[in-house]
């Protein structure tokens, strides 16, 4: 942990800050010409597995945007490979699991003893941490147990999560075994990132919004809480837990014990924070598509979010999901600058 007193880390802990910190999910991506140039040489997975290149991509984006944190360049699905579930990226389709899980026997065969084989991610974290030192914190991350399990079972993206829910409802013991194995791998994987210099860990639960509150509490909350507690025990860095389409789940997500809850754009920030009883920090929550809007509209929406935060310690400005391809880079830069300037004028030091 190289930047424990940074604006971003202090906000994660709901400590007073001089202005609202800002960073963006998928801030290194195809919308940037520098990233596209790297992708002409390497595939996404090749970048992830080359620490020098992953670090370069991470650093370039953070410096170009002048944000308050650098999130390591990696992919959510990397842990699947070391568990014995190969995947590849299909043009136009995204990730494809070559042999999806369909039964308990397949779950039993999954390995949990190879998390250290993902050490190339930790090596990239170290390079980024060494580069920035105390100037800029580094965010490590992993996918949440539910979202990764969904990929493993569906074999890729899904509209109705039929196979996931069939296994969850019909084979609850096998389902819990799968999530337990994921927790074992993910806790080691993220702990290695922290040892390498990550100041914060974000857990991405991108698909959790497909669940009812009842199903989330019964089938997902216990193992997700286990992951958060394991990380807090072994690393003592703040944990951000982010899900999409999750407004109805927010009170339950708070029970994981994560220090920060990420909001998507579907719930107003002030309402989302109220649902969380203002007991945690929050991150969000601009609609990524607004980055395509003309500046007056984009500025107005960002201003609204900052006003909804109402000067409370613990707000980190971000999008409600990742930056989209073809997003105008200048809009992202202008937004980061505006958040810095407007939030410092709006609230000053927060007590």
Swiss-Prot record:
It comes from the Bacteria. Pfam families: URO-D (PF01208). Gene3D superfamilies: 3.20.20.210. InterPro entries: UROD/MetE-like_sf, Uroporphyrinogen_deCO2ase_HemE, Uroporphyrinogen_deCOase. Its EC number is 4.1.1.37. One of its GO terms (cellular component) is cytosol. One of its GO terms (biological process) is protoporphyrinogen IX biosynthetic process. The keyword Chaperone does not apply. Pathway: Porphyrin-containing compound metabolism; protoporphyrin-IX biosynthesis; coproporphyrinogen-III from 5-aminolevulinate: step 4/4. It is found in: Cytoplasm. Substrate binds at residues 26-30, 75, 151, 206, 321. It catalyses: uroporphyrinogen III + 4 H(+) = coproporphyrinogen III + 4 CO2. Signal peptide: none annotated. Keywords: Cytoplasm, Decarboxylase, Lyase, Porphyrin biosynthesis. The record marks 75 as: Transition state stabilizer. One of its GO terms (molecular function) is uroporphyrinogen decarboxylase activity. It is an enzyme of class 4 (lyase). PANTHER family: METHYLTETRAHYDROFOLATE:HOMOCYSTEINE METHYLTRANSFERASE RELATED (PTHR21091), UROPORPHYRINOGEN DECARBOXYLASE (PTHR21091:SF169). Belongs to the uroporphyrinogen decarboxylase family. Catalyzes the decarboxylation of four acetate groups of uroporphyrinogen-III to yield coproporphyrinogen-III. Homodimer. This is Uroporphyrinogen decarboxylase. The gene is hemE.
């Amino acid at each position: 942990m190289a930047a424990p007193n940074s604006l971003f880390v202090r906000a994660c802990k709901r400590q007073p800050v001089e202005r609202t910190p800002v960073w963006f999910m998928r801030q290194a991506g195809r919308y940037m010409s520098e990233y596209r140039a790297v992708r002409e040489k390497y595939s996404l997975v090749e970048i992830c597995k080359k620490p020098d290149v992953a670090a370069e991509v991470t650093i370039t984006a953070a410096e170009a945007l002048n944000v308050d944190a650098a999130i390591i360049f990696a992919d959510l699905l990397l842990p699947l490979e070391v568990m014995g579930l190969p995947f590849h990226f299909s043009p136009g389709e995204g990730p494809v699991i070559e042999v999806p899980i369909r039964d308990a026997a397949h779950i039993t065969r999954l390995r949990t003893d190879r998390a250290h084989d993902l050490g190339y991610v930790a090596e990239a974290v170290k390079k980024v941490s060494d580069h920035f030192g105390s100037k800029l914190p580094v965010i490590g991350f992993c996918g949440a147990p539910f979202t990764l399990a969904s990929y493993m079972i569906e074999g890729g993206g899904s509209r109705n999560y039929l196979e996931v829910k069939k296994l969850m409802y019909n084979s609850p013991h096998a389902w819990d075994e799968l999530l337990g194995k994921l927790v074992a791998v993910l806790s080691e994987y993220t702990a290695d990132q922290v040892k390498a210099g990550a100041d914060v860990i974000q857990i991405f639960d991108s698909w959790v919004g497909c669940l009812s509150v009842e199903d989330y509490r019964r089938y997902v909350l216990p193992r997700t809480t286990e992951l958060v507690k394991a990380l807090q025990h072994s690393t003592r860095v703040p944990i951000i837990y982010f899900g999409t389409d999750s407004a109805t789940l927010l009170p339950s997500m708070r029970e994981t014990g994560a220090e920060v809850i990420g909001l998507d754009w579907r719930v107003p920030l002030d309402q989302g924070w109220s649902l969380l009883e203002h007991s945690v920090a929050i991150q969000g929550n601009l609609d990524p598509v607004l980055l395509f809007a003309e500046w007056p509209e984009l500025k107005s929406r960002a201003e609204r979010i900052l006003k909804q935060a109402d000067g409370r310690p613990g707000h980190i400005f971000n999008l409600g999901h990742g930056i989209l391809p073809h997003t105008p880079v200048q809009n992202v830069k202008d937004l980061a600058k505006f958040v810095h300037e407007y939030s410092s004028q709006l609230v000053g030091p927060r007590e």
